[in-house]
């Protein structure tokens, strides 16, 4: 009987030890970086640098509530340019970046939480453009503008379309109107929102060539326990209708 008691006690201690290991260090803080990518993430004042409560948007509101529900500390900074932010998320332990497309070639570079929302990939042209496209291959003959470091630009380059990239995606709207490019490869609704910010309206979609899901990408150093807690919190938010409610504020 004493032997059985020891075995039972030992099993209980193992369970308790596992529970302790699963607890997140209360002092641990995830360093979150984002960019101006409306309506998902944006600085309240429209600038290229903001922190904490001075950042809003669909993904920002979801991520803030997700971390709150999971009981995990975070800091949040909006910076520029995206290529630099992405590199920091890739290389810095304890960092995370959002929102970014979860592509097969990126799968093993991060730990992922999401999806936070959809992002259709489109080719936009001026309202009076005569360009008609049925495939990406047909776009090869045109000058295409894209956003440096973005999944869309990377995908186009991989397929040999050689996009002309810029550090601010809204600059492509102006380049389009000035005739410096024929097409703008961007996300929808983000592209139209950015275009309006620089006074460009009436752009037309000549091709919709992909539909991606946007995620929070965490550095691989972030523990699996934290990733699981965040994913569980997001799943619960979606189940409760909170994600839809947040999207309704902006769209």
Name what the model sees in each region.
Residues 57-69, 216-250:
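Extended ligand-binding regions for polar small-molecule ligands
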Residues 34-37, 119-122, 196-231:
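Periplasmic-binding protein-like
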Residues 38, 52-65, 126-159, 165-167, ...:
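Bilobed "Venus flytrap"/periplasmic-binding protein-like clamshell domains
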Residues 68-70, 78-79, 83-95, 111, ...:
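Short helices/loops that flank or line small-molecule/ion binding pockets
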Residues 26, 151-164, 235-251:
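Ligand-binding clefts/hinges and TM-proximal coupling segments of bilobed small-molecule sensing domains
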Residues 8-17:
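Bacterial N-terminal signal peptides
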Residues 24-101, 108, 146:
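Extracytoplasmic small-molecule ligand-binding "clamshell" domains
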Residues 77-138, 149, 207:
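Acidic, polar ligand-binding/catalytic clefts
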